[in-house]
Regions:
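Post-Walker A helix-loop "phosphate-sensing" segment adjacent to the P-loop in P-loop NTPases
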Residues: 136-146
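Short beta-strand-centered segment that lines the nucleotide-binding/catalytic pocket of NTP-utilizing
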Residues: 144-155
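Long, positively charged, glycine-interspersed low-complexity recognition regions
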Residues: 112, 132, 148-150
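C-terminal accessory "lid"/substrate-recognition subdomains
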Residues: 1-117, 140, 154-158
Length: 158
């Protein structure tokens, strides 16, 4: 103990409290922070194994069937505008924002430091990419550490 830089008495400590103590010592981020990854994917390529939450947005109109949008992706403004032009898309997005805003403090309370939110559509190119981008923007505006990954957005390109 005399030569230790840190000493943690774990005799009456839960594992989550130990985790919080260790993170507070060795990480620059406070224990109430979380890294959130928003992933878009195509169901035809499989659900990401690392996903904590998976949302299926195939219920929304598909830009794939609009000739001028087919070759674009949810990273393009025209596609995002099209996807979000429907009341059903706007309602779903609002409900998902509300759900995630509710869940994050619950996960933080349980000591979760990483959260992976996955959005899936048929090919992972249009609707899921739009929703992943929008969720990442929403989380960032709320001062949360969020990043976006588009797993399948380029899979069908030749």
């Amino acid at each position: 103990r005399e030569i230790a830089d840190y000493y943690i008495d774990t005799s009456l400590m839960s594992t989550s409290t130990l985790k919080e103590n260790v993170l507070n010592i060795f990480l620059d981020t406070p224990s109430d922070s979380m890294t959130i990854s928003c992933i878009s994917f195509g169901f035809k390529y499989g659900v990401p194994n690392e996903a904590d939450l998976v949302f299926d947005v195939r219920c929304l109109p598909n830009p794939y069937y609009i000739p001028e949008l087919k070759e674009k992706s949810g990273l393009d403004k025209e596609v995002r505008d099209y996807v979000m032009s429907f009341e059903s898309s706007q309602t779903l997005q609002t409900k998902l924002f509300d759900l995630i805003d509710f869940l994050i403090p619950q996960y933080l309370h349980e000591g979760k430091s990483q959260l992976v939110i996955a959005f899936g559509c048929t090919g992972g190119k249009h609707r899921s990419a739009t929703f992943a981008e929008n969720m990442c923007e929403h989380l960032s505006k709320n001062h949360l550490k969020a990043r976006v990954l588009h797993r399948d957005v380029n899979k069908d390109k030749k």
